[in-house]
Amino acid sequence: MAKYFGTDGIRGEVANSTITVEFTQKLGNAVGSLINQKNYPKFVIVGQDTRSSGGFLKFALVSGLNAAGIDVLDLGVVPTPVVAFMTVKHRAAAGFVITASHNKFTDNGIKLFSSNGFKLDDALEEEVEDMIDGDFIYQPQFKFGSYKILANAIDEYIESIHSRFAKFVNYKGKVVVDCAHGAASHNFEALLDKFGINYVSIASNPDGLNINVGCGATCVSNIKKAVKEQKADLGISLDGDADRIIIVDENGQEIDGDGILNILAQYSNICGGTNGIVGTQMTNMSYENHYRANKIPFIRSKVGDRYVLEDLVKYGYKIGGESSGHVINLNFGTTGDGLFTAIQLLAIFSQADKPVSEFKLQGELMQQTLINVPLTKKVAREDLQKVASDVNDVEKRLGNRGRVLLRPSGTEPVLRVMVEADDKSLATNEAEYLVEKVKQKLV
């Protein structure tokens, strides 16, 4: 079981958990030393979101890397997918993002990309963890690394997207965008300006403390309200580091990551094409049934965009994502990318020329009840055997009317209990039954 890494990097409360200056410096030194061992290019890229703690954590990371002899190129405040993009483009050994994604400002963390722009696999994460727990390694003084700033990183990213989609995007509707006071602030607006989009921007004034506060992809009520007030045709909501996207139609109705994937699947010719779709264990069964009916191959991965990516590569598909809004298109990038996904959607909406509401899956979705159960410590998957018989009982009662998923959080001591059924009260009752069993046997 991983000691530091969760499903999406390392994350926690600043100064009151793993996320300290000392740890972050050791992480930089560990990765730098590993780069030396593997004879990779002695050069990495770093970026950050808008949290007040981002600056001092970044420089702790840089000091550990420089001591190990690694040169650092700092992109400043940029969305996470920009770091992945630039890591590949500039042939860096690795890319780091100082971010806690959709979490509150008191948290922070580090996301880490390998040279191909992919999140680290489990084996490489274990190597990094072993190095963190080892000695701090200094290179000889004449081999210390350098530190440089690249001010125009977002311009390279925007130009790459524009060159691919300029001929498709001609959207005439009014758009509201919610940048979560995060890394997309000003950067997303620059991208939309490049395509000539008529938009109103909200939650785009970061002060270091307001990231994700009452806004962003995990608080869709903000964008729903704004779409109605502005009489807009579309709402786009990103999270703090802009690797998630949720959209809202002209009626203020949410379309989550599952719904976005379905739109991309129906118009995959505009998005570069795909032989199938990768969702996750959380993907609503209604979409799985829809893909099957339309002869679109569909695979469920474990939750986490790194696992979506692994299955995209394994099965040779190009498009995948999560209900939460991580959407990956391997025709362009290697990680969840809210900005690029937004442009793909604007291209589709431009070409199809119908209201956003008409792109939604018709009919009622299966009803999901998700309950987070706090635990005293992180639970391993083998611990779930203690409630296996209870899960089996629920599955028997549901029959072919639904399904059950128990999933330990990868970032905190929480067990997520999800029951999906064709009736909301049935899903809720069975979920509450399982929560009681979990509290009796695991808490």
Swiss-Prot record:
Keywords: Isomerase, Magnesium, Metal-binding, Phosphoprotein. InterPro entries: A-D-PHexomutase_a/b/a-I (IPR005844), A-D-PHexomutase_a/b/a-I/II/III (IPR016055), A-D-PHexomutase_a/b/a-II (IPR005845), A-D-PHexomutase_a/b/a-III (IPR005846), A-D-PHexomutase_C (IPR005843), A-D-PHexomutase_C_sf (IPR036900), Alpha-D-phosphohexomutase_SF (IPR005841), GlmM_bact (IPR006352). The modification Phosphoserine is found at S101. Pfam families: PGM_PMM_I (PF02878), PGM_PMM_II (PF02879), PGM_PMM_III (PF02880), PGM_PMM_IV (PF00408). The keyword Nucleotide-binding does not apply. CDD domains: GlmM. SUPFAM superfamilies: Phosphoglucomutase, C-terminal domain (SSF55957), Phosphoglucomutase, first 3 domains (SSF53738). GO terms for molecular function: magnesium ion binding; phosphoglucosamine mutase activity; phosphomannomutase activity. Activated by phosphorylation. The active site is at S101 (phosphoserine intermediate). Its EC number is 5.4.2.10. Catalyzes the conversion of glucosamine-6-phosphate to glucosamine-1-phosphate. This is Phosphoglucosamine mutase. It comes from Francisella tularensis subsp. mediasiatica (strain FSC147). The lineage of its organism: Bacteria, Pseudomonadati, Pseudomonadota, Gammaproteobacteria, Thiotrichales.
